Amino acid sequence: MKKVFYINDKLKSLLSNIIYEIQNYNSTIMKYTENIQNNIDNPNYIKDNKATILRQSFLIDKTMKLFYDFSDINSNNLILNKTSEDINKIIEGITKDFEDLLLSKRIKIKFNNNENEEVKYNYITLLDKSKIENSISNIFLFIYNMAKVNSFVEISYSSIDYNDEEFLFNNGLKNNLINNNLLIEIIFESQNIPEELELKLFKTPLLTYNENSFNNLYLYTAYNIIVKHSGDIWIDAIENRNKKKFNIILPINKNYE
């Protein structure tokens, strides 16, 4: 039976924001398209504006996919699906998709595929590939909106074991989840995220802070997708207050090669 997804005032406001953003992107694309037509003899102008159009189109596409996930978050089709997709390839693919967008903000990317692990694993995730892709994409979009120019993003992943009591104690996690899990770390440098905002990140899709609206729909959606599949996600501050780390845990079956 499909669960009813009630629309309250906060959700109506959220939907209005999404519609406004999409209209804004479409308006921007039309403006740059007209400029290209009016400057057809200027190759450099055309090149710069095409890049802008591609970025805007990319954001529209991601927003619409995210909106679909969010609107469907309480339905019964979010069931555990097994897939043999290589997590490494999934993350590399998402990174490639976001490369131009992040580079446009001069965000440097370092990808660490954890080649130093002594034992190689095949990961059979208990979460559909599209949900993994959308969740990680949503986190990248959150970083894109939060990170300042000349930021740095480092992506890595490693396997963890919930039977490790020290890990459980340090992270305050419950041990009633699946023993074998996959931990993905996305590290980025940015100016301080206000503590009040950070505490509320996973509780509401639309926030107001210092009289400014802050739409963290991307992170909120990623959190819901992962947690509803018995995973977990949280933010750590590391080394200094300008560096943040997303920790994403996905439930998996781990098979030795």
Q: Which positions does each model-derived feature cover?
A:
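Short beta-strand/loop element within the Bergerat-fold HATPase_c
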Residues: 150-165, 174-178
